[in-house]
Regions:
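N-terminal secretory signal peptides that target proteins for export/translocation
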Residues: 1-6
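Bacterial N-terminal signal peptides
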Residues: 9-20
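Boundary at the C-terminal end of the N-terminal hydrophobic targeting segment
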Residues: 20-27
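Eukaryotic scaffold repeat domains enriched in small/polar residues
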Residues: 27-339
Length: 339
């Protein structure tokens, strides 16, 4: 075995069918290659510091959230700003404007749902940009739309990782087991911070921001666990061990304020193929729909500086990768594996 083969290790895949019956873990083939991925250009140049998320909505328009900002901005495919949510007139209504948006999503009809951390609420807007409903929630972190006029929310203060609501704000189900790895409740709360992405079939993917072993769980549209990718091999072991030692030190004294190191920076999913893209710092990994690692890259800006993604939007022919404060960049979407 050559030295390059020894350096890279494969992820351990744990797959569960819809009824959550455990299957034997399947080790992936050893991964041997890591390539540079260079951004082509910067998009939406007025978006930089405070960037949170970008999503594609109806008519090919792009919706962009920055914080703090009173609204989600809408751009046409050419990059021209054409509107906002809430609309300028609707924003005058009490409680309609955003205080500090953390996450959002837009559906095929143009409805928008926002995790407004500053208002401690979820806000649902109509396609016209009017505030349709507000759901009080102490710490909404991430949100995605699901089929059937539902949306899923991740919040570390709930009993499960994900809670699904209808458009009227009624809870329809919750799912996803929390990770309890510390003696202190406040540390476990931070460990269960996570972000959601979803594909066209309604599968939703929860990525743990702070769990020492990089972990992403795939749930089907009704909440059954379908797949777990947990990276526990030599490539990731030193960072995981350091994170667990830091958590153990926090357990020694209640006076230590929990401050964990972010593990997974961003996750994106191809809405059609269900390929998953996971970023850990500047390392960007591509997985097929079964959780097999296909390729690895290091992300760079056009002038050569490294970029640590905070969001990945997967499109048919490109990747849109955003970061705070650098902004949003277009990256090529490699079609062939490195040789």
């Amino acid at each position: 075995m050559n030295r390059l083969q020894c350096v890279c290790a494969a992820a351990v895949l744990v797959a569960l069918p819809a009824l959550c019956l455990s299957l034997p873990a399947r080790a992936q083939e050893q991964y041997q290659f890591e390539s540079d991925l260079l951004a082509k250009r910067q998009l939406f140049r007025d978006v930089a510091a405070g960037f949170r998320e970008i999503h594609r909505g109806p008519n090919g328009n792009y919706y962009v959230l920055t914080a703090p900002a009173p609204a989600v901005m809408i751009y046409d495919p050419s990059g021209k700003r054409i509107g906002q949510v809430p609309s300028a007139s609707a924003a005058a209504v009490k409680g309609a404007a955003l205080v500090y948006g953390q996450s959002f999503d837009v559906d095929h009809d143009g409805r928008v749902v926002v995790c407004d951390r500053g208002a401690k609420a979820l806000k649902i807007y109509s396609p016209r940009g009017d505030l349709a409903a507000t759901i009080t929630m102490p710490a909404p972190v991430s949100v995605v739309f699901l089929p059937g006029d539902e949306f899923a929310v991740a919040s570390p203060d709930t009993d499960h990782l994900v809670t699904a609501y209808d458009l009227e704000g009624k809870i329809v189900r919750d799912y996803g087991d929390r990770e309890e790895i510390a003696d202190r409740a406040d540390v476990n709360t931070q460990v269960n911070f996570g972000h959601l992405v979803a594909d066209e079939m309604g599968n939703n993917y929860f990525s743990f921001d702070y769990l020492p072993e990089p972990t992403v769980r795939k749930f089907d549209r009704v909440g059954y666990l379908a797949l777990e990718i947990s990276l526990k091999t030599l490539e990731f072991a030193p960072a995981a061990q350091a994170a667990r030692k830091a958590i153990a030190r926090m357990g020694e004294s209640e006076r230590i304020v929990p401050s964990l190191h972010r593990i997974i920076s961003a996750v994106g999913v191809d809405p059609r193929t269900q390929e998953l893209w996971i970023a850990i710092g500047t390392l960007l990994m591509r997985f097929d729909k079964d959780g097999q690692r296909l390729s690895s890259f290091r992300t760079y800006l056009p002038y050569g500086a490294r970029l640590e993604p905070s969001q990945i939007l997967v499109e048919p022919d490109r990747l849109l990768i955003g970061a705070d404060p650098q902004g949003i960049y277009e990256f090529p979407k490699p079609e062939k594996l490195p040789h």
